[in-house]
């Protein structure tokens, strides 16, 4: 690569003509005076970049010239060019100006109304003040409230009556004047520290009560459980008839387990347990089938019981004397012997709607009673 030096400089007339013709192009005249042999890298690193002249073209290289965009790298060394930044003026924090609230009527005091009341009570020797005395102390010590709208007095009254830190003390008979006094409640006296009324944090039990403590009334689909309801018996026509076991309601099986244990806690509905309202048609059909079967079984049972009682009375009229009646008083009757003990159905413990489909039909249950 030929090295440009001063010996290759063109005549001055030719340079002037080229400058006139190529004013729109980037000026590269500094390349003619550049020589790699005479350059000092240390001086280039410490020197500031030259300020472009007005006559020079734009600083960005022309399109397609990628040589000036990226400098060659030698190994892993990196040359950093320090730039001499002008020292920026540092913003010094402005000193906080103390405001005299007794004379300055344009600045509102940064205290709450409850704090103002506490400050007035602390300044008093008796630690109890009337409402008018609290007004006077605030207006004397804070000029803002002297010229402000008198609506702030309503806020003072509301804080005295609603804030639990203040309590009203009745006026004694020997004390002149009208109205009662206001003072701080001794239980909350520790909240007023260094002229500021602090607020206590609510305990976690009040902020997040457990959801399981919510109780509900009887659900319309849940049967009301009564103690001893499964052991009651009906007496009809001189013969005792055992009461059939109540079938569980298949509408809401998820609520039956808490009800059997006597628990009234609210349990959220689980959509996987089949208690959604989408299955109301199927559940209503199952309930109607169960009720029809129960009615048919009860009618057949009542007719069979009545016929058996009439047959016994017609067949054994001469044997009903006092001696036979007394001898059979401690024994079980024929119908009691025939009766089978009512066993609690296993599906009452599970709570699935599908158990209703596998229940024995009503005509088979009638045969067991005969």
Curated annotation (Swiss-Prot):
InterPro entries: FH_FOXJ1, Fork_head_dom, FOXJ1, TF_fork_head_CS_1, TF_fork_head_CS_2, WH-like_DNA-bd_sf, WH_DNA-bd_sf. Residues 108-202 bind DNA. SMART domains: FH. SUPFAM superfamilies: Winged helix' DNA-binding domain (SSF46785). One of its GO terms (cellular component) is nucleus. Keywords: Activator, Cilium biogenesis/degradation, DNA-binding, Nucleus, Transcription, Transcription regulation. The lineage of its organism: Eukaryota, Metazoa, Chordata, Craniata, Vertebrata. This is Forkhead box protein J1.2.
């Amino acid at each position: 690569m030929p090295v440009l030096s001063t010996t290759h400089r063109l005549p001055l007339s030719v340079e002037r003509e080229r400058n006139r013709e190529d004013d729109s192009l980037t000026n590269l005249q500094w390349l003619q005076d550049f020589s790699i042999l005479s350059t000092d890298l240390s001086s280039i690193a410490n020197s500031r970049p030259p300020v472009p002249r007005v006559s020079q073209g734009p600083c960005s290289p022309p399109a397609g010239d990628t040589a000036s965009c990226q400098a060659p790298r030698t190994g892993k060394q990196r040359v950093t060019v320090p730039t001499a930044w002008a020292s920026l003026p540092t913003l010094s924090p402005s000193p906080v100006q103390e405001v005299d609230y007794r004379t300055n009527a344009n600045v509102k005091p940064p205290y709450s109304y409850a704090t103002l009341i506490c400050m007035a009570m602390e300044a008093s020797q008796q630690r109890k003040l009337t409402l008018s005395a609290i007004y006077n102390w605030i207006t004397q010590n804070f000029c803002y409230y002297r010229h402000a709208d008198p609506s702030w007095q309503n806020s003072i009254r509301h804080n005295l009556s609603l804030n639990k830190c203040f309590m009203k003390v009745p006026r004694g008979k020997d004390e002149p004047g009208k109205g009662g006094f206001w003072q701080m409640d001794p239980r909350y006296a520790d909240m007023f520290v260094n002229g500021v009324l602090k607020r206590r944090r609510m305990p976690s039990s009040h902020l997040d009560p457990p959801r399981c403590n919510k109780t509900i009334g009887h659900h319309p689909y849940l049967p009301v459980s009564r103690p001893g309801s499964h052991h009651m018996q009906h007496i009809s026509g001189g013969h005792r008839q055992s009461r059939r076991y109540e079938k569980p309601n298949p509408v809401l099986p998820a609520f039956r387990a808490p009800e059997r244990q006597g628990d009234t806690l609210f349990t959220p509905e689980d959509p996987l347990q089949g208690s959604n309202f989408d299955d109301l048609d199927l559940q209503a059909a199952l309930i109607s089938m169960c009720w029809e079967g129960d009615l048919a079984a009860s009618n057949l049972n009542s007719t069979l019981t009545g016929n058996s009682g009439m047959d016994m009375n017609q067949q054994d009229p001469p044997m009903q004397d006092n001696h036979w009646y007394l001898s059979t008083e401690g024994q079980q009757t024929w119908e009691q012997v025939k009766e089978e003990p009512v066993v609690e159905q296993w599906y009452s413990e599970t709570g699935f709607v599908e158990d209703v489909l596998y229940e024995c039909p009503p005509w088979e249950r009638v045969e067991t009673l005969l």
